[in-house]
Curated annotation (Swiss-Prot):
Top-level taxonomic group: Eukaryota
Stated name of the protein: DM7 family protein GG19680
Start-end of Basic and acidic residues biased regions: 415-430
UniProt region (Disordered), positions on chain: 415-443
SMART domains from the UniProt entry: DM7
InterPro entries in UniProt: DM7 (IPR006610)
Family: Belongs to the DM7 family.
Keywords in alphabetical order: Repeat
Length: 543
């Protein structure tokens, strides 16, 4: 009988072994084979006093020695367990494959703090001894032990997932009566059914295990179907921390600007939960199908007495990571716009589609994403300059055809003012001839430079300012069908001229968003809203 959880230990973390009344020799203690291959490294196993006896000679010999230790997770013990009473053992007395571990002697842990699933229902007397150990990252067991574990098979213990079970109803007070939700007309009890997900292609990189935490619990229920015998206005369902894990993006959506539809919970059924135990309403896109609003109670927020009174014998079991606390609960309001549909038929269709996709894709070793055959645009703008050396940030170019091949779509030329001399109309012809000669000479002295898409816009704008009057036009309008060239050039000109103002507006929008996020975070955590006395903003670097 054991439970496992994730954990680690800092190198060199030791503690002095003091005089103790219980120090067994556990080198021959063997765990299930799946534990040695699991990403969870901490195990809590029950010991038996008649089998794992106290080694008095070893306790006297190792008294005062430095023994490896680690932080024992409090989430594996219900209530307030005296974790400081653990006795960490020397490495030679630990089971094979463990780098640190300790024991709680018989009667050290109160019965209310002893793991629920590790004691028999009819156990009497003092609490049995308990072993808490941290496995090494890589364990190589002897071949004899591996063959023994293969013959024994997997232990029918709670390995990675546990099924939360209610205690017997005789623990209720005699004057209290169970008010099960199945007997009410305004609420219904549902069972959360997770649609089968399509198989994911194997990845060469191992996935990092995310530790289970219950400070906040916001699952994504968009792929969950609620199966209910009767359709009522509100429905209640027990969720699974294994099948419906916490999703950080959903938590950010609830604390951001996204709308979370709310409704009033029946006060005669649900207690008033405040602070971290309050129900969290989810955005509409993360709700199950057919629901217009819904909220989630995180694990441990509702008492076990409430589950026994209102869920009773009708509560469907769901796998949980930790059975020491009550499971999460979903309360949803059914949408009146969506018509009732056959859930079983929908489940069969989804399951059939998942099976067909699994048969077609499950045998593939790896799925490489298709690369679209889209040419990468490198160039952006071609500019005529009077100097052979290209401007800062630009590159030399031979012709407009070469610029078009690089992806350039805009060309910039130096504008020339046309001065009309009305006082000397007889000299128009000679003046036009002189201008033609100057223009031809200037054309011979002009050079082409091009800028990339990711070039510095300030350098491009400064070069255009040095040109004086600059005129922008499209290199080839026929290559851009359906594009309003005049509108594009107008917007580009505004970007060049008002770029500083645009940056200031974007910076202000970012600061406003940060202010709203900090304010909503403080409201969610019930913290007083304080502004910085220097900059007038919410928590900043001056705090």
């Amino acid at each position: 009988m054991l439970q496992i959880a994730s954990g680690n230990r800092e190198e060199g973390q030791v503690v002095e072994l003091k005089k103790t009344k219980y120090l067994p020799y556990l080198f021959n203690l063997v765990m299930p084979k799946s534990f040695y291959h699991s990403h969870n490294r901490i195990v809590v196993a029950r010991l038996y006093s008649n089998v794992h006896k106290h080694d008095k000679q070893a306790a006297e010999f190792f008294e005062g020695f430095q023994t490896p230790c680690f932080e024992v997770p409090a989430s594996m013990f219900p209530g307030e367990a005296p974790l400081n009473k653990i006795v960490f053992m020397p490495p030679v007395m630990l089971p094979m494959g463990f780098e640190a571990g300790g024991v709680f002697g018989p009667g050290v842990l109160p019965r209310r703090s002893y793991p629920i699933d590790l004691t028999a229902s009819g156990h009497k007397g003092q609490s049995p001894p308990l072993f808490v150990g941290l496995r090494r990252l890589y364990v190589q067991l002897p071949s004899e032990i591996e063959s023994f574990l293969d013959k024994m098979g997997e232990f029918p213990a709670t390995q990675d997932t546990l099924v939360y079970g209610m205690r017997r109803s005789n623990q209720l007070l005699k004057e209290e009566q169970a008010q099960e939700l199945m007997l009410r007309n305004d609420l219904s009890l549902s069972m959360a059914y997770n649609l089968p997900a399509p198989p994911t292609p194997p990845s060469p990189y191992p996935y990092r295990h995310v530790p289970v935490q219950y400070n906040i619990y916001t699952p994504d229920l968009s792929n969950v179907l609620m199966m209910m015998p009767h359709q009522r206005k509100l429905t209640v369902a027990i969720l699974s921390t294994v099948n419906n894990p916490h999703v950080p993006s959903v938590a950010l959506a609830t604390m951001g600007d996204e709308e979370c539809p709310k409704f009033e919970l029946p006060s005669d059924v649900f207690p008033i939960c405040e602070g971290v135990n309050r129900p969290i309403f989810l955005p509409r896109r993360f709700l199950p199908k057919g629901f217009e609003s819904g909220c989630v109670f995180k694990p441990g927020s509702l008492s076990e007495l409430w589950f026994m009174g209102y869920m009773g014998r009708f509560s469907p079991p769901q796998p949980q990571h930790n059975c020491a606390i009550t499971p999460p609960l979903f309360v949803g309001k059914i949408s009146r716009v969506v018509l009732a549909f056959d859930l079983m038929k929908n489940i069969q269709m989804e399951y059939g589609a998942a099976q067909s996709s699994a048969q077609s894709e499950g045998s593939l070793n790896a799925v490489e994403p298709k690369k679209p055959n889209v040419p990468i645009t490198k160039g952006f703008l071609v500019m005529e300059t009077e100097h052979p050396t290209p401007p800062s940030g630009g590159y030399s170019l031979q012709s407009y055809q070469e610029g078009s091949a690089k992806g350039c779509v805009v060309k910039v030329e130096k504008g020339e003012t046309q001065e009309m001399d009305e006082a000397h109309p007889t000299k128009e012809e000679s003046k036009s001839e002189e201008e033609g000669e100057v223009q031809s000479g200037s054309q011979e002295e002009k050079y082409l430079s091009w800028f990339k898409v990711d070039s510095d816009i300030d350098l491009i704008a400064e070069t255009m300012v040095d040109m004086g009057t600059a005129q922008m036009s499209l290199i080839d309008e026929e290559a851009l069908p359906g594009v309003d060239g005049a509108c594009v050039l107008n917007q580009l000109r505004e970007v060049f001229e008002d770029r500083n103002e645009i940056r200031q507006n974007i910076d202000q929008l970012i600061h406003d968003h940060i202010y709203r996020m900090n304010r909503d975070r403080m409201l969610a955590l019930r913290l007083p809203i304080r502004t910085c006395f220097r900059c007038g903003l919410l928590p900043c670097r001056h705090f």
